[in-house]
From Swiss-Prot:
Residue numbers spanned by region Disordered: 1-107
Originating species: Homo sapiens
Name assigned to this protein: High mobility group protein HMG-I/HMG-Y
Biased composition (Acidic residues): 93-107
Effect of residue 58 to A: Decreases methylation by PRMT6. Abolishes methylation by PRMT6
Length: 107
């Protein structure tokens, strides 16, 4: 039984070598090495004079997890002194925040 299975796998491997395309497992295919523009054919290039646009990263940048609040909210501070850390909420600010939420619900 085991002999027949090993025989069947050998011809398949030889066919793949003849085709020139190696098929690996079901996982993600390997990234092809980048081809330098000097070795590529000049006739195959569509726009040789225009510089191709660089690829932009997808999704959220790595270091931007906790930076959203710093950009959106500007605090007024006394000149010459920079407060560090999270600002403390005053009781008045908390009450104003609650009243604003209730007024939005009514509209």
């Amino acid at each position: 039984m085991s002999e027949s299975s090993s025989k069947s796998s050998q011809p398949l491997a030889s066919k793949q070598e003849k085709d020139g395309t190696e098929k690996r497992g079901r996982g993600r295919p390997r990234k092809q090495p980048p081809v330098s523009p000097g070795t590529a054919l000049v006739g195959s290039q569509k726009e040789p004079s225009e510089v191709p646009t660089p690829k932009r990263p997808r999704g959220r940048p790595k270091g931007s997890k906790n930076k959203g609040a710093a950009k959106t909210r500007k605090t007024t501070t006394t000149p010459g002194r920079k407060p560090r850390g999270r600002p403390k909420k005053l009781e008045k600010e908390e009450e104003e925040g609650i009243s604003q939420e209730s007024s939005e619900e009514e509209q």
